[in-house]
Each structure stands twice: as structure tokens, then as C-alpha cells.
Amino acid sequence: MELPGNIKQAKKAFYGDTALIDGADTTACMQLENMDSMYYGCVALASVQIPDSAKELSNICNGCVNLKEVHIPSAAQKMNSSFFGCTALESITGEIPSSCTDSGNLFSGCKFLSGTLTVSCTSRTTLSSSFSDAATAGTGLTIILRYDAEKSQETANTGFYGGTKSADEILNALKASMEATFSSGSHITITTNADKTEG
């Protein structure tokens, strides 16, 4: 099914469709922003397209146990439980942008996650439960935490870590909060790449 190019929201469009195998064709969707719970519970879903315009992605593929690859859009803002329980998920393309400040349980239970994922961070980024019980099998996942100095300037006075924290302090706090939720069998490595030009 091809979605029209002018569509802006597809919230719960295929919610609970257990027979759906291929997700909708979103090639022409340059304005699609809300995909909240679009494929929630689609247990047979094997492929999905997520355009870079998408912002609202909470629960988009929650429980899609046959999905193996996903793309994270550059405009993402809300990704709470987006791929929760996607037990076959292996590959992630794109990166988690600094605009995303809601990512609780994002990849929880995705035991085969592997490869490298970059997360662009600000003082408002929270990742404490995003990878709980993830990457417990397979070849392992490397997460690169990258400090977004420009975006952090915009949120300096409202950030969860305050406006006086350095890039290293923010990234190290994020790393510690993430590691505290990893299961004992997780094969996840976190590295930080602080931008020393933060000013």
C-alpha cells in the first residue's frame, strides 16, 4: 500500500494487524510526522519504511517480533517504546538525533541488536531505559554518544543536567544511567565523543 504524499499523520493506521507483512510505502511522504503506534502489535511485519520527516514515533513497531531492520529518521522527537519487544531486530540505520528527548524503552528486549549506533546528545537527552534487556545475543552493539554543542546552547537553561555542566559531564552521566539498566548478559559498549568546541 502506497500512502499519499500529502499525509501528515498515520497514528494507529495498522494497529494490531497481525496479518500485515510489508509496511506501507512512504516514499512520497514528505510531510508525514505522526506515526505513533502505526504498526503496534503487527507480529508478522517484516519490513517498514520510516521517512525522515517523522517526529512522533512512540510505539510505532512495539511488539513487531519479525522485524529485522529499522531506520531512525533525522526529525525524530518522541520514540518511547518505538521498538519495544522487537526480538528479531538486528540492524539500525540512521542515528538518534538530538531532537529526540523521549526514548524510554526504545529498544528494550531487542536481544539481537548489533552494529554501531550514534546518539546525538544535549543536556535534555535521557536514555536510562532505552536499551534495557537489549543486545543479549548476536555480535554486540556499540553506542557512540556524541555531544551536540549547538543544540545544547538552545536548551542550556532547561536541561536535565543544568546549564553549567560540561560536555564530558553530560555524556558520562548519560553513560552511567544507561549502563545501570543493562542486563548482565548485554553485549553493549558505550563510547563518548564530546565536542570540545562547545564554548
Report each predicted region and the residues it spans.
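Structural signature of tandem-repeat unit edges
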Residues: M1-K8, T18-E33, V43-E56, V65-Q77, ...
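Consensus positions within tandem repeat domains that build extended binding/scaffold surfaces
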Residues: Q9-Y15, N34-Y40, S58-N62, N80-F84, ...
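Short, flexible/disordered intra-domain loops and linkers
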Residues: Q153-G162
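Intrinsically disordered, low-complexity segments enriched in small/polar residues
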Residues: A13, S37-M38, L89, L145, ...
